[in-house]
């Protein structure tokens, strides 16, 4: 059976329904993850974590170990550096396929939370002065805190759409009364880590665009990415952020997609560097 250098199988296996999973298949699946039934500190245990993370694939550990040992930086004129650049370019293309994002660009950051703060900051500071920043009470503190801070600095009002306690959701109909032509930035939580419910991002985006077509719309997809498909091309948004450690990867980095429009806003960049680059410093190729 063909595998890559990190032990990932190159074929797509058809996964049987849960009732048909054999002991051998279950053992095969469990064998792909680290610390399945044992904590290095606690000893034997079952990993029940509803929102804070996921088990880590052994292939992720091997991949991280491999690239952590390479001393070369990206952007140098040598074979090692060229390979790192190739790996990153391929990873970005794969991300576009995985999240159906034929346009825009991907970049890495410290964490999903840090990336949401950065996108919100640049959207608030780069949009027309005044107006509103719109979110909902369903959202994680990552977006609510970022919007509260940067709306105040940008001289904008931060408005929160109340969610429905009974359904654990917020809908396009809930957003609609609060959208005005002065809505500069809007945030949407794709899936709640508290209620477990997913919202209709495309419907909420459409309601916003109808009244405020120039609004920068940023989506917190951190919890959703582990549980549902992502179709960025269908959402009509400007930013989408995930935390790969919730998808069987590891801690230590986050992933953001941004539209060309958001990417072109003023942002932190090195003197003499590419003006559309949102990554500062050398990237961890193993994360890609």
For each predicted feature, which ranges?
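Acidic, Ala/Val/Gly-enriched low-complexity intrinsically disordered segments
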Residues: 2-4
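Pyridoxal 5′-phosphate
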Residues: 6-288
């Amino acid at each position: 059976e063909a595998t890559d250098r990190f032990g990932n199988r190159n074929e797509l296996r058809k996964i049987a329904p849960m009732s048909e999973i054999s002991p051998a298949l279950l053992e095969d699946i469990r064998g792909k993850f680290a610390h399945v039934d044992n904590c290095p500190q606690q000893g034997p245990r079952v990993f029940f974590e509803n929102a804070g993370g996921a088990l880590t694939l052994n292939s992720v550990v091997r991949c991280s170990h491999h690239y952590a040992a390479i001393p070369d930086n990206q952007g140098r004129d040598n074979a090692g550096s060229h390979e790192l650049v190739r790996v990153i370019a391929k990873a970005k293309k794969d991300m576009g396929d995985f999240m159906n994002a034929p346009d825009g660009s991907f970049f890495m950051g410290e964490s999903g939370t840090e990336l949401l703060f950065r996108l919100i900051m640049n959207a608030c500071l780069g949009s027309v002065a005044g107006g509103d920043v719109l979110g909902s009470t369903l959202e994680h503190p990552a977006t609510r805190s970022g919007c509260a801070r940067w709306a105040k600095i940008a001289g904008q009002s931060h408005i929160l759409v109340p969610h429905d306690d009974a359904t654990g959701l917020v809908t396009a109909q809930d957003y609609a009364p609060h959208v005005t032509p002065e809505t500069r930035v809007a945030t949407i939580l794709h899936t709640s880590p508290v209620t477990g419910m997913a919202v209709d991002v495309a419907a909420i985006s459409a309601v916003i665009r109808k009244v405020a077509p120039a609004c920068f719309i940023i989506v917190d997809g951190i919890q959703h990415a582990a549980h549902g498909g992502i179709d960025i091309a269908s959402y009509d948004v400007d930013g989408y952020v995930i935390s790969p450690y919730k998808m069987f990867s590891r801690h230590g980095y986050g992933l953001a997609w941004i539209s060309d429009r958001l990417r072109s806003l003023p942002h932190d960049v090195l003197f003499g560097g590419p003006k559309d680059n949102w990554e500062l410093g050398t990237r961890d190729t193993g994360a890609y």
